[in-house]
C-alpha cells in the first residue's frame, strides 16, 4: 500500500481494505467528476448532541476527497449500496483532526463535534496519516504565503549616483540598511560621521517613471488606474476580471514595461488614438440629413406641378376615363350620363336642388354639344341614387379642366391603393389636389432607401494592435492548456501541481 503514503500527490483513487475490488470501483464512480479519494475506510459516523453524548448518525465508507472542481478537500461518507452521499465535511482553515483512540477519531464539524468510528484500525491509521499529512502541508504553505508579503513586491529601480565623496561609505551604508542587528550592536561603539545633504550629489540619468498601479498578487488597482491606460484597455477589450487576474495582469504589465513604461505607452496612445476618432464620429452625422432634406421637397413639387399638367391633358384625358369606368356600355350616351352626375358634387357649394339644372347646359356646351341635349332630362334623376351606392367610383366624372384634373388625381390615388379613404367625396379640384398632396407625402416618407455609411473599423495597429495581439496569444494559451492547471497558482495554499484533471 505504498500508494497511500503520499496520497495528496497521487492522482489515483485509494480504496478501502475491507471492500472488494468491485465495491471499490463502485465507490470511485460515486465520487463525481474530477474527484479523487486519497484514503477510504469503513466507518460509523457519530455526532455529539447538546448533552455531550455521542449519537450514531450513519454507516458507510469514509473518503478523504480531493475535489478539483471546488478546489477544496472534503471528508465524505458514501452508501455503496444505494450509491449516494450520506454526509460531508469540508476541511476548513485551521481544521484540527484528533485521534483519542486508534479507531476513534474526532474533529469539530460545522454544527457539532463529529467522530469517526473505524471498523479496522489499519484503515484508521492510514486514514489519519492521509488527513494529517494534508493538514501539515497546507499549514506550511500558508506560512510561506504569510511571509512572502514582507519582501518587496516590486523590484526597486537602482539609480547610479556619481559622487566620489560618498563612494567610500557606500558599503557601510548598505550594511546598515540590510542588517538591522549589526546596527544595534554598533550603536555602543564610536559612531562614524553621518552623511549630510551637502555630501549627496545630484543623481545622473534620472528618469521619473509613472506608477502603473499593478501588484503581482492582486493585479491592477482599478480605483487608481490611469485614465489613459484604462482607455487603452477598453480599446483592446480587456475586462476588469482580466486586470484583476494575477497571470493576465502580469502579461499586460510586462508588455507595458517592454514598450518603454507607462509614459511611453501614453505618448504612443496620444499620438495614434486621436486621429481615428474624429472621422468615425464625424462620418455618421452627414448621411442622415440628405434623406430628410430630399424627402420633403418632392411632395411640394408635385403639388405645384400637378395643376399645370391637367389643363393641357384635359381634352385627351377626359375621354379615356369614361370607358374603363363603364365597361358594360360602349354607346356615346353613357359618357353624357357620366357628365351629368358631376352636378351633384357641386351640391356643397350651392343648394341640393339648384345645382343639377345649371351645370348641365354649361358642360354640354363645352364638351360635346350634340349628345348632351337629348339625355338631360332622363339622366337627372338616376345620378342621385347612384351616388350613395357607388360614390367612390362614379364621382370622378366631372368634365372640363377641373374634371380632367380630378380624374387624373383619382386615377393616381387608385394606382397607389389609397382609394379607401374615409373622408367624403371631394367637391372641387382644389380639395382633390390637397388629397393627392397628402397621399404623396405618405408614400414619399417610406419610398426612399436609407444611405448608410459603413462603420470605420477600430484601429488595430500601433500600441493598441500590439496589446490586442498579446492578449490573443494569452487567450490561446489559456484555452490550449488545461483549465485546472492554469488556475492552480490562484489558490492561497496550493502548489502549481496541486489540482489535476
Swiss-Prot record:
PTM comment, free text: Phosphorylation at Ser-239, Tyr-253, Ser-480 and Ser-481 enhances actin polymerization activity.
Major localization listed first in the record, in broad terms: cytoplasm
Domain WH1 span(s) in chain numbering: 31-138
CRIB domain residues: 200-213
Residues modified as Phosphoserine: 239, 480-481
Residue ranges annotated for the WH2 domain, each copy included: 401-418, 429-446
Biased composition (Acidic residues): 482-501
Keywords of this entry: Acetylation, Actin-binding, Cell cycle, Cell division, Cytoplasm, Cytoskeleton, Methylation, Mitosis, Nucleus, Phosphoprotein, Repeat, Transcription, Transcription regulation
Alphabetized GO MF terms: actin binding
Stretches with biased composition (Polar residues): 442-453
Single GO biological process annotation from the record: negative regulation of membrane tubulation
Residue numbers of Phosphotyrosine PTMs: 253
Database matches in InterPro entries: CRIB_dom (IPR000095), CRIB_dom_sf (IPR036936), PH-like_dom_sf (IPR011993), WAS_C (IPR011026), WASPfam_EVH1 (IPR033927), WH1/EVH1_dom (IPR000697), WH2_dom (IPR003124)
Domain of life: Eukaryota
Keyword Transmembrane: no
Modification type N-acetylserine: residues: 2
Listed SMART domains: PBD, WH1, WH2
Keyword Cell cycle in annotation: yes
Annotated positions of the Omega-N-methylarginine modification: 304
A Pfam family the protein falls into: PBD
Biased composition (Pro residues): 273-387
Region annotation (Disordered) ranges: 135-158, 263-403, 442-501
Quaternary organization: Binds actin and the Arp2/3 complex. Interacts with CDC42. Interacts with FCHSD1. Interacts with FCHSD2. Binds to SH3 domains of GRB2. Interacts with the C-terminal SH3 domain of DNMBP. Interacts with SNX9. Interacts with the WW domains of PRPF40A/FBP11. Interacts with PTK2/FAK1. Interacts with PACSIN1, PACSIN2 and PACSIN3. Interacts with NOSTRIN. Binds to TNK2. Interacts with SNX33. Interacts with NONO (via second RRM domain); the interaction is direct. Component of a multiprotein complex with NONO and SFPQ; associates with the complex via direct interaction with NONO.
Protein role: Regulates actin polymerization by stimulating the actin-nucleating activity of the Arp2/3 complex. Involved in various processes, such as mitosis and cytokinesis, via its role in the regulation of actin polymerization. Together with CDC42, involved in the extension and maintenance of the formation of thin, actin-rich surface projections called filopodia. In addition to its role in the cytoplasm, also plays a role in the nucleus by regulating gene transcription, probably by promoting nuclear actin polymerization.
The protein's name: Actin nucleation-promoting factor WASL
Amino acid at each position: 500500500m505504498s500508494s497511500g503514503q503520499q496520497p495528496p500527490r497521487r492522482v489515483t483513487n485509494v480504496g478501502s481494505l475491507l471492500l472488494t475490488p468491485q465495491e471499490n470501483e463502485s465507490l470511485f464512480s460515486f465520487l463525481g467528476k474530477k474527484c479523487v479519494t486519497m484514503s477510504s475506510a469503513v466507518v460509523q459516523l457519530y455526532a455529539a448532541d447538546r448533552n455531550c453524548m455521542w449519537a450514531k448518525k450513519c454507516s458507510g465508507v469514509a473518503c478523504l476527497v480531493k475535489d478539483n472542481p471546488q478546489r477544496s478537500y472534503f471528508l465524505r461518507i458514501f452508501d455503496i449500496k444505494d450509491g449516494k452521499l450520506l454526509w460531508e465535511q469540508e476541511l476548513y482553515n485551521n481544521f484540527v483532526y484528533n485521534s483519542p483512540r486508534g479507531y476513534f477519531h474526532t474533529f469539530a464539524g460545522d454544527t457539532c463535534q463529529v467522530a469517526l468510528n473505524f471498523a479496522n484500525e489499519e484503515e484508521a491509521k492510514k486514514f489519519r496519516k492521509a488527513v494529517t499529512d494534508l493538514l501539515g502541508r497546507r499549514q506550511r504553505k500558508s506560512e510561506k504565503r504569510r511571509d512572502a508579503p514582507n519582501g518587496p513586491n516590486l523590484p526597486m529601480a537602482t539609480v547610479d549616483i556619481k559622487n566620489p565623496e560618498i563612494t567610500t561609505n557606500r558599503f557601510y551604508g548598505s550594511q546598515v540598511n540590510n542588517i538591522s542587528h549589526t546596527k544595534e550592536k554598533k550603536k555602543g561603539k564610536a559612531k562614524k560621521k553621518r552623511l549630510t545633504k551637502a555630501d549627496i550629489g545630484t543623481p545622473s540619468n534620472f528618469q521619473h517613471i509613472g506608477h502603473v498601479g499593478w501588484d503581482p498578487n492582486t493585479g491592477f488597482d482599478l480605483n487608481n488606474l490611469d485614465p489613459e491606460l484604462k482607455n487603452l484597455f477598453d480599446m483592446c477589450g480587456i475586462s476588469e476580471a482580466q486586470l484583476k487576474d494575477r497571470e493576465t495582469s502580469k502579461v499586460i504589465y510586462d508588455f507595458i514595461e517592454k514598450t518603454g513604461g507607462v509614459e511611453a505607452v501614453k505618448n504612443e496612445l496620444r499620438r495614434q488614438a486621436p486621429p481615428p476618432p474624429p472621422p468615425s464620429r464625424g462620418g455618421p452625422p452627414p448621411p442622415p440629413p440628405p434623406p430628410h432634406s430630399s424627402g420633403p421637397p418632392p411632395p411640394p413639387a408635385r403639388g405645384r406641378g400637378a395643376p399645370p399638367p391637367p389643363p393641357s391633358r384635359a381634352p385627351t384625358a377626359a375621354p379615356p376615363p369614361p370607358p374603363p369606368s363603364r365597361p358594360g356600355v360602349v354607346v356615346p350616351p353613357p359618357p353624357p350620363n357620366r357628365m351629368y352626375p358631376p352636378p351633384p358634387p357641386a351640391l356643397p357649394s350651392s343648394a341640393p336642388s339648384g345645382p343639377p339644372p345649371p351645370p348641365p347646359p354649361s358642360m354640354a356646351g363645352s364638351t360635346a354639344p350634340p349628345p348632351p341635349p337629348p339625355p338631360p332630362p332622363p339622366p337627372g334623376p338616376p345620378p342621385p341614387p347612384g351616388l350613395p351606392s357607388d360614390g367612390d367610383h362614379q364621382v370622378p366624372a366631372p368634365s372640363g379642366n377641373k374634371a380632367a384634373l380630378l380624374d387624373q388625381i383619382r386615377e393616381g390615388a387608385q394606382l397607389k391603393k389609397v382609394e379607401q379613404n374615409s373622408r367624403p367625396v371631394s367637391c372641387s379640384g382644389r380639395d382633390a389636389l390637397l388629397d393627392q398632396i397628402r397621399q404623396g407625402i405618405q408614400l414619399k416618407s417610406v419610398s426612399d432607401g436609407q444611405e448608410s455609411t459603413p462603420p470605420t473599423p477600430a484601429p488595430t495597429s500601433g500600441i493598441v494592435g500590439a496589446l490586442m495581439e498579446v492578449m490573443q496569444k494569452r487567450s490561446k494559451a489559456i484555452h490550449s492548456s488545461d483549465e485546472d492547471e492554469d488556475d492552480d497558482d490562484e489558490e492561497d495554499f496550493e502548489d502549481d501541481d496541486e489540482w489535476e484533471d
